[in-house]
Amino acid sequence: MKSQLRKKTLEALSALSNEDILQKTERMYKYLFSLPEWQNAGTIAVTISRGLEIPTRPVIEQAWEEGKQVCIPKCHPDTKKMQFRTYQTDDQLETVYAGLLEPVIEKTKEVNPSQIDLMIVPGVCFDVNGFRVGFGGGYYDRYLSEYEGKTVSLLLECQLFAHVPRLPHDIPVHKLITEDRIISCFS
């Protein structure tokens, strides 16, 4: 079921023009930057987007412009764990498996979960309760089980479903932000 939802959602995203995506994400970013969770955050955790993911570069640049610390994930496939590390310049990045851009350990510092004020959690599709279908690695679900801060996800309306399959270890995000609205999932 998850793989079918992933496929359906990625097909819908592929059908959008670059202009559509740009217009929709600009509205989404305005919602994000207006949230108290964003405005009060000193440290933001976010991925470096690629492919059909919601572009995160504008989010990173806005955070830097506002003097916020940005941290990005470093995945450890051998342990299936993830950590967040500081990110200030592109020379701190390296291309790893599957073409992902991740922080270079020697050029960055680890950020403890308790230091992250707001985490922007990626996903392929979501339901209105904040549950998500990711890319299948389980890294975020494992990390979120130990993270107590605020979480939001950025998505287009075509990525939103009434229900997505969930497992007992799945953890919902607090808020979903689309091009049309902010959905508070739970408190």
From Swiss-Prot:
Q: Which organism is it from?
A: Bacillus subtilis (strain 168)
UniProt entry tagged with the keyword tRNA processing: no
Q: Mind telling me which Gene3D superfamilies this protein's record contains? A: NagB/RpiA/CoA transferase-like
State the source organism's domain of life: Bacteria
Enumerate the NCBIfam families for this protein: MTHFS_bact
| GO cellular component terms attached to this protein's record | cytoplasm
Per its record, how is this protein called by name? Uncharacterized protein YqgN
Q: Which family does it belong to?
A: Belongs to the 5-formyltetrahydrofolate cyclo-ligase family.
Q: Where does ATP bind?
A: K2, S3, Q4, L5, R6, G134, F135, G136, G137, G138, Y139, Y140, D141, D170
Q: Where is the signal peptide?
A: none
InterPro entries referenced in this protein's UniProt entry, alphabetically? FTHF_cligase, FTHF_cligase-like_sf, NagB/RpiA_transferase-like
The Swiss-Prot or TrEMBL record annotates one GO molecular function as: 5-formyltetrahydrofolate cyclo-ligase activity
Keywords, comma-separated and alphabetical: ATP-binding, Nucleotide-binding
- What's one GO BP annotation on this UniProt entry? tetrahydrofolate interconversion
